[in-house]
Amino acid sequence: MSVNLSKGQRINLSKEVEGLSKIMVGLGWDAAKQSGGILNHLFGSTSYSIDCDASAITMGNGNKYRACIYYGNLSEDNVYHHGDNLTGDGDGDDEQITVDLAHLSSEIERIVFVVNIYNCTERKQDFGLIKNAYIRLVDESTGKEICKYNLSDDYAGKTAMIFAEVYRNNGEWKFNAIG
Protein backbone atom coordinates (compact mmCIF):
# COMPACT_ATOMS: atom_id res chain seq x y z
CA MET A 1 0.00 0.00 0.00
CA SER A 2 1.38 3.39 -1.01
CA VAL A 3 2.19 5.99 1.65
CA ASN A 4 0.92 9.54 0.99
CA LEU A 5 3.49 12.00 2.28
CA SER A 6 3.32 15.59 3.45
CA LYS A 7 5.96 18.27 2.97
CA GLY A 8 8.98 17.50 5.16
CA GLN A 9 7.89 13.93 5.89
CA ARG A 10 10.48 11.15 5.62
CA ILE A 11 10.11 7.41 5.25
CA ASN A 12 12.55 4.54 5.43
CA LEU A 13 12.40 2.87 2.01
CA SER A 14 14.46 -0.10 3.20
CA LYS A 15 11.80 -0.86 5.84
CA GLU A 16 8.84 -0.21 3.51
CA VAL A 17 10.13 -2.72 0.93
CA GLU A 18 12.52 -5.42 2.09
CA GLY A 19 15.32 -6.00 -0.41
CA LEU A 20 14.49 -2.87 -2.44
CA SER A 21 17.08 -2.68 -5.20
CA LYS A 22 15.70 -0.47 -7.98
CA ILE A 23 13.22 2.39 -7.91
CA MET A 24 11.43 4.37 -10.58
CA VAL A 25 10.85 7.99 -9.65
CA GLY A 26 7.84 9.43 -11.45
CA LEU A 27 7.32 13.17 -11.59
CA GLY A 28 4.11 14.72 -12.86
CA TRP A 29 2.41 18.09 -13.29
CA ASP A 30 -0.30 19.80 -15.27
CA ALA A 31 -0.37 23.27 -16.74
CA ALA A 32 -3.03 25.49 -15.23
CA LYS A 33 -5.86 26.64 -17.47
CA GLN A 34 -5.70 30.14 -18.92
CA SER A 35 -8.68 32.25 -18.02
CA GLY A 36 -10.08 35.58 -19.03
CA GLY A 37 -10.34 37.29 -22.37
CA ILE A 38 -13.17 37.18 -24.85
CA LEU A 39 -11.65 34.40 -26.97
CA ASN A 40 -11.31 32.12 -23.95
CA HIS A 41 -14.90 32.95 -23.03
CA LEU A 42 -16.13 32.07 -26.54
CA PHE A 43 -13.99 29.01 -27.17
CA GLY A 44 -13.23 27.78 -23.67
CA SER A 45 -10.04 28.08 -21.68
CA THR A 46 -6.82 26.49 -22.84
CA SER A 47 -3.75 25.31 -20.96
CA TYR A 48 -0.45 27.09 -20.90
CA SER A 49 2.34 25.35 -22.80
CA ILE A 50 4.98 24.78 -20.12
CA ASP A 51 8.11 22.65 -20.55
CA CYS A 52 9.17 21.38 -17.13
CA ASP A 53 12.38 19.37 -16.91
CA ALA A 54 13.12 16.83 -14.18
CA SER A 55 16.68 16.08 -13.13
CA ALA A 56 18.45 13.89 -10.60
CA ILE A 57 21.60 15.19 -8.93
CA THR A 58 23.87 12.62 -7.31
CA MET A 59 25.81 13.77 -4.25
CA GLY A 60 28.79 12.14 -2.61
CA ASN A 61 30.43 12.40 0.79
CA GLY A 62 29.88 15.77 2.42
CA ASN A 63 27.18 16.65 -0.14
CA LYS A 64 29.79 16.92 -2.88
CA TYR A 65 28.29 17.14 -6.38
CA ARG A 66 28.93 14.07 -8.59
CA ALA A 67 26.60 14.24 -11.58
CA CYS A 68 23.39 15.67 -12.99
CA ILE A 69 21.15 13.29 -14.89
CA TYR A 70 18.66 15.11 -17.14
CA TYR A 71 17.40 15.24 -20.75
CA GLY A 72 20.91 16.16 -21.97
CA ASN A 73 22.73 13.47 -19.93
CA LEU A 74 20.37 10.50 -19.72
CA SER A 75 22.46 8.15 -17.58
CA GLU A 76 25.28 8.25 -15.10
CA ASP A 77 26.10 6.65 -11.73
CA ASN A 78 23.39 3.95 -12.31
CA VAL A 79 20.70 6.62 -12.55
CA TYR A 80 18.69 6.70 -15.79
CA HIS A 81 16.46 9.49 -17.15
CA HIS A 82 13.73 8.20 -19.48
CA GLY A 83 13.59 11.32 -21.68
CA ASP A 84 12.09 14.78 -21.92
CA ASN A 85 8.35 15.51 -21.99
CA LEU A 86 8.02 18.91 -23.66
CA THR A 87 4.43 19.70 -22.68
CA GLY A 88 3.34 17.87 -19.52
CA ASP A 89 0.16 16.85 -21.36
CA GLY A 90 -1.66 13.63 -20.56
CA ASP A 91 -2.25 11.61 -17.43
CA GLY A 92 0.36 9.87 -15.31
CA ASP A 93 4.05 10.60 -14.96
CA ASP A 94 5.44 13.31 -17.22
CA GLU A 95 9.06 12.29 -16.68
CA GLN A 96 10.62 9.24 -15.06
CA ILE A 97 14.02 8.52 -13.59
CA THR A 98 15.17 5.03 -12.59
CA VAL A 99 17.71 4.54 -9.80
CA ASP A 100 19.53 1.21 -9.43
CA LEU A 101 20.11 1.38 -5.67
CA ALA A 102 21.85 -2.00 -5.57
CA HIS A 103 24.55 -0.89 -8.00
CA LEU A 104 25.10 2.72 -6.92
CA SER A 105 28.62 3.56 -5.88
CA SER A 106 29.03 3.43 -2.11
CA GLU A 107 30.28 7.02 -2.42
CA ILE A 108 26.81 8.27 -3.39
CA GLU A 109 24.97 9.40 -0.28
CA ARG A 110 21.97 11.15 -1.80
CA ILE A 111 20.07 11.79 -4.99
CA VAL A 112 18.19 15.07 -5.21
CA PHE A 113 15.22 15.32 -7.60
CA VAL A 114 14.65 18.77 -9.03
CA VAL A 115 12.30 20.26 -11.62
CA ASN A 116 12.83 23.50 -13.49
CA ILE A 117 10.87 25.34 -16.17
CA TYR A 118 12.73 25.50 -19.48
CA ASN A 119 13.18 29.05 -20.85
CA CYS A 120 11.20 30.41 -17.89
CA THR A 121 12.47 33.98 -18.20
CA GLU A 122 11.85 34.25 -21.93
CA ARG A 123 8.38 32.69 -21.61
CA LYS A 124 7.53 34.56 -18.37
CA GLN A 125 6.52 31.33 -16.64
CA ASP A 126 6.79 30.09 -13.07
CA PHE A 127 5.35 27.32 -10.91
CA GLY A 128 2.27 29.45 -10.25
CA LEU A 129 1.15 28.21 -13.69
CA ILE A 130 1.51 24.56 -12.62
CA LYS A 131 -1.05 22.42 -10.78
CA ASN A 132 -1.25 18.81 -9.60
CA ALA A 133 2.53 18.45 -9.21
CA TYR A 134 3.75 15.25 -7.56
CA ILE A 135 6.66 12.89 -7.12
CA ARG A 136 6.21 9.18 -6.52
CA LEU A 137 8.46 6.16 -6.00
CA VAL A 138 7.74 2.75 -7.49
CA ASP A 139 9.46 -0.56 -6.70
CA GLU A 140 10.77 -1.54 -10.16
CA SER A 141 10.66 -5.27 -9.39
CA THR A 142 6.93 -5.32 -8.58
CA GLY A 143 5.59 -2.15 -10.21
CA LYS A 144 3.97 -1.19 -6.90
CA GLU A 145 3.97 2.42 -5.76
CA ILE A 146 5.85 2.84 -2.47
CA CYS A 147 5.03 6.46 -1.73
CA LYS A 148 3.71 9.66 -3.29
CA TYR A 149 4.08 13.32 -2.40
CA ASN A 150 1.59 15.81 -3.86
CA LEU A 151 3.02 19.32 -3.86
CA SER A 152 0.13 21.54 -2.79
CA ASP A 153 1.75 24.82 -1.71
CA ASP A 154 1.62 27.98 -3.81
CA TYR A 155 4.88 28.15 -5.74
CA ALA A 156 4.18 31.32 -7.74
CA GLY A 157 7.40 33.14 -8.61
CA LYS A 158 9.55 30.00 -8.39
CA THR A 159 11.10 28.61 -11.59
CA ALA A 160 13.06 25.68 -10.14
CA MET A 161 12.31 23.46 -7.17
CA ILE A 162 13.71 20.56 -5.22
CA PHE A 163 10.83 18.08 -5.11
CA ALA A 164 12.46 15.40 -2.93
CA GLU A 165 15.57 13.39 -2.17
CA VAL A 166 16.53 9.77 -1.65
CA TYR A 167 19.44 9.38 0.74
CA ARG A 168 21.50 6.68 2.41
CA ASN A 169 21.60 6.64 6.21
CA ASN A 170 23.30 3.84 8.17
CA GLY A 171 23.06 1.51 5.18
CA GLU A 172 19.35 2.16 4.62
CA TRP A 173 17.67 4.18 1.86
CA LYS A 174 15.26 6.90 2.94
CA PHE A 175 13.00 9.37 1.15
CA ASN A 176 12.45 13.01 2.12
CA ALA A 177 9.53 14.99 0.64
CA ILE A 178 10.98 18.50 0.31
CA GLY A 179 8.82 20.52 -2.12
Model-derived features with residue positions:
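Intrinsic-disorder/low-complexity signal
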Residues: M1-G179
